Structure formats: structure tokens, C-alpha cells
């Protein structure tokens, strides 16, 4: 990925995935975890349990010596502040354009607070459309009101 530092373990995992011809959707079926979460583990943006790490490595035909790295707390955030990858940049652009409007609508509906990125799921779906397939991204996070003291 241009402009993004990819760790050696991520490269190894992605190469094994490609060599096996396995998709993230395949891994979802094999591991019983969402494909986006599995991709986050591979990119070291999420941590797996020992059991999850062992299953992932087994599916990819890799040895268990990588388990400690996959189960360690991960350092969150990849790439430059302003992303350079075109697809990732679109999400940055969406937040630049719709971030404040989204914030205001959330505050109207829930009050003063934030959406959790910890108690959170993210789903990606493909929707067929005669004018061109559509990407459907659903973010679902727990609302966390600001505490008063």
C-alpha cells in the first residue's frame, strides 16, 4: 500500500492468504469472526485471542510462532494523517464533508457524547445496482455520553 507502513507479520500473513487463494469472507466462515475484524488483526489494528490466532495461522498454513505477535495489544492507526491511497482517502473526504453534519445529527438524537470505536462493528456489503455495484458500509458503535462531575 502506497504511503502505509506494513509490518513484516502483516506482509507474511497477506502473502500466505494470497498463496492459499483465501478471501476474508472465507476466513470469516472458517474462524467465526467478521471479515473486517479478521483483516484488522492481519493489519495489526486488532488483537486476537490465542485460540483465534492459532486458527488463523492454521488456515493460512503458518506456524504458531506468530501467535504472540497476533495476541499482543496492537498499535492503532496506519499511514499518514491525510491518506494517499484513493479508496482510503474517500473515507477521509467523507468525514471532511459529512463529519460535522453527522456529529450534529448524532447529538440531536442522543445528546452530548461520542460513538465508541471500541464497542463497535463495521460491516461491508456489496449491493447490486443496474447503474453499477454499490459499496454499503455500516458502522455500529455504542453511544457514550460525556460524564458530568
UniProtKB/Swiss-Prot annotation:
GO terms for biological process: cyanate metabolic process. CDD domains: Cyanase_C. Transmembrane segments: none annotated. It catalyses: cyanate + hydrogencarbonate + 3 H(+) = NH4(+) + 2 CO2. Signal peptide: none annotated. It comes from the Bacteria. Keywords: Lyase. InterPro entries: Cyanase (IPR008076), Cyanate_lyase_C (IPR003712), Cyanate_lyase_C_sf (IPR036581), Lambda_DNA-bd_dom_sf (IPR010982). Belongs to the cyanase family. HAMAP family: Cyanate_hydrat. This is Cyanate hydratase. The gene is cynS.
